[in-house]
């Protein structure tokens, strides 16, 4: 259904990695989205570079931090713009009013570049959601979720291979249901056609299963143990491979029956197993009727990679802190978080770095070295004479 990926990377500096993004992309999308219409100072490209630079160089991002960086020599060198003067309130207003579609399209374009660079075009997709909590007195339009003093912003992500391929931000109460939120994220992602997506028990709606199958999207999920299935075929269980962490008990194909006794049009596969380490029973549901049963179980196990991704962006990219409480501003910052995560994850994989913390630190240091080299050249010097100072090996 999709290829097992073989990672063979020769290494790449942070500067080389960023240069994979065409310099013309910013202007092309600016024209397409009209992001710079009637704007003199804080163009879409400047805002993109300011947010990336500020996220990399600050442990807790704020508008004041961004204002300080905007006026710094380091950022002027990084962005290629010499004169940049704006107050924090101008930055705030720009984030709140800038066309978020510009950043959405940048995210989609940048994903496509690095998805190909990482050889992950046919990789498995994992889908899940996470929340950001805000004080109710500061953000009244978010979701309620059991705490009257807080409101929540939810964003749902498709993680294709190791990097995010799409994201949606939700603030309306009906999206508290994963059946609604995750189903929408999967249904709207045309790139999932002919590919496989894995998600947890958040989606149980038979209608969602039918929609995925109708649109040619393969899925694997976990279900309740008492799922109702009108069994038509009992498949023979294949030999358990070495390294498997579950033992398959049954493997059946049939039509699912909803709580209202509605029978699905398509056949689905219900796989029951036990987790070897705990003896806990587990049930999988999929519309992949022919794949090896233990292979399906191993693919479902990869779902945990998106939990690791959420932990990474919250711990190292400050995804829990919102610079803007305006819905448009929140979308801009979420798209930018996704873009920066792509850069760091790609850098980590290409250079075979184990931890996210060290990958982010080395990425930052290499960009600093690039800035120093540019300053040396501007002053008439030759950075190659001190090449040993710029080595991150």
Task: Tell me the role of every PLM-derived stretch.
Residues 48, 52, 64-68, 89, ...:
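N-terminal, well-ordered alpha-helical segments
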Residues 61-80:
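DNA-recognition alpha helix
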Residues 84-87:
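Short coil turns linking two alpha-helices in DNA-binding domains
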Residues 90-159:
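Active-site-proximal, Lys/Arg-enriched surface segment
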């Amino acid at each position: 259904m999709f290829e097992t990926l073989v990672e063979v990377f020769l290494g790449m500096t942070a500067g080389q990695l960023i240069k994979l993004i065409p310099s013309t992309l910013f202007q092309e999308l600016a024209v397409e989205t009209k992001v710079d219409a009637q704007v003199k100072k804080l163009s879409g490209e400047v805002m993109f570079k300011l947010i990336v630079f500020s996220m990399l160089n600050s442990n807790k991002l704020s508008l004041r931090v961004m204002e300080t960086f905007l006026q710094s020599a380091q950022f002027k060198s990084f962005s290629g713009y010499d004169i940049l003067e704006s107050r924090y309130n101008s930055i705030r207003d720009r984030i709140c009013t800038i066309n978020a579609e510009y950043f959405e399209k940048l995210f989609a374009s940048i994903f496509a570049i690095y998805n190909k660079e990482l050889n992950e075009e046919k990789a498995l997709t994992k889908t899940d959601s996470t929340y950001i909590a805000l004080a109710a007195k500061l953000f009244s339009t978010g979701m309620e979720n059991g705490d009257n003093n807080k409101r929540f912003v939810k964003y749902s992500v498709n993680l294709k291979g190791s990097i995010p391929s799409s994201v949606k931000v939700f603030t309306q109460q009906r999206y508290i249901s994963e059946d609604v939120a995750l189903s929408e994220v999967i249904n709207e992602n045309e790139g999932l056609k002919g590919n496989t997506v894995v998600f947890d028990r958040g989606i149980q709606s038979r209608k969602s299963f039918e929609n995925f199958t109708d649109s040619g999207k393969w899925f694997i999920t976990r279900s309740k143990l008492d799922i109702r299935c009108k069994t038509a075929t009992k498949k023979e269980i294949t030999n358990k491979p070495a390294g498997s962490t579950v033992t398959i008990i049954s493997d059946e194909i049939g039509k699912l029956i909803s709580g209202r006794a509605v029978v699905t049009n398509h056949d689905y596969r219900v796989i029951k197993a036990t987790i070897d380490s705990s003896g806990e029973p587990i049930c999988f549901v999929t519309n992949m009727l022919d794949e090896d049963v233990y292979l399906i179980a191993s693919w479902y196990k990869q779902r945990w990679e998106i939990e690791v991704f959420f932990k990474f962006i919250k711990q190292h990219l400050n995804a829990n802190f919102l610079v803007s409480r305006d819905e448009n501003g929140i979308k801009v910052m979420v798209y930018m978080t996704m873009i920066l995560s792509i850069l760091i994850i790609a850098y980590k994989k290409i250079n075979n770095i184990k931890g996210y913390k060290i990958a982010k630190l080395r990425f930052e240091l290499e960009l600093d070295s690039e800035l120093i080299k540019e300053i040396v050249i501007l002053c008439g010097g030759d950075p190659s004479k001190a090449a040993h100072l710029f080595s991150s090996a």
